[in-house]
Design a protein with these regions (language model features):
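Aromatic-rich carbohydrate-binding modules that target alpha-glucans
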Residues: 46, 53-98, 106-132
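Aromatic- and glycine-enriched glycan-recognition loops and surfaces
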Residues: 82-96, 180-198
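Coil residues (strongly favoring Ser/Thr
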Residues: 19-20, 47, 155, 194
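C-terminal edge beta-strand
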Residues: 17-28
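Core domains of carbohydrate- and sulfate-ester-processing enzymes
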Residues: 109-161
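Extracellular ectodomain segments of secreted/surface proteins
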Residues: 26-53
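Exposed beta-strand face motif in extracellular beta-rich ectodomains
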Residues: 2-6, 97-99
């Protein structure tokens, strides 16, 4: 197996056209059990390592693509298979740095991790800095669709209300609200100022 770039250059009448295509020749699929204790999604192992697990039944190949490999499905990023689950270990990550990534499934389907806590969308460029400061830019021209984001070395959230006591789950009333569609400012600060029970 291996990774290859096929490059073509054509010249005619003083004009030159160049094109290329990425091809990988696959070796044997690595079959290995998902390491003990891992759950589907992003598993943070330490400051520089994550293990990714994806449930994808009846698939033949799954690759991890992202900022760490310039969004190219190199054979070194082919996930190991364990029945209907696929897994991969990413190492040498920079603590605290956000990495966008996706799964390339059977060469023609590209998806974000379904369990990710943060995504990037091509439409994100319309989000004002005041609404989301320092939003990681979408990888324009490198991929398409929604991407997942992982980040090792995240700081734990400091809870400011130490006296909060959550009610029993059976007494909760939960509803979903898409802030983007609910208020023009698209931010949580305006939402909490608008709804008087926060």
């Amino acid at each position: 197996g291996g990774d290859y770039w096929l490059k073509v250059r054509a010249e005619s009448g003083g004009e030159t056209v160049v094109d290329s295509v990425f091809v990988h020749v696959l070796g044997e699929q690595v079959l290995a059990p998902v390491p003990e204790g891992l759950v589907d999604g992003i598993n943070y192992i330490d400051e520089t390592t994550v293990q990714l697990v994806l449930y994808a039944p009846m698939k033949e190949n799954v690759f991890v693509i992202g900022d760490f490999n310039n969004w190219v499905p190199y054979t070194d990023y082919r996930m190991a298979k364990d029945g209907d689950r696929w897994w991969f270990t990413l190492t040498d990550l920079v603590p605290g740095k956000e990495y966008g990534f996706q799964y390339q499934v059977d060469s023609d389907v590209i998806i974000a991790d379904p369990y990710t806590e943060k995504t990037l969308d091509p439409k994100d460029r319309g989000i004002p800095e005041a609404t989301y400061p320092n939003l990681k830019p979408y990888p324009e021209g490198l991929t398409s669709g929604i991407t997942a984001v992982l980040q090792t070395g995240q700081e734990n959230y400091d809870w400011v209300n130490a006296s909060f006591d959550a009610p029993p789950q059976e007494e909760l009333v939960i509803y979903e609200l898409l802030v983007r569609d609910f208020i023009a400012a698209h931010d949580y600060k305006t939402l909490t100022d608008t709804l008087n029970y926060f």
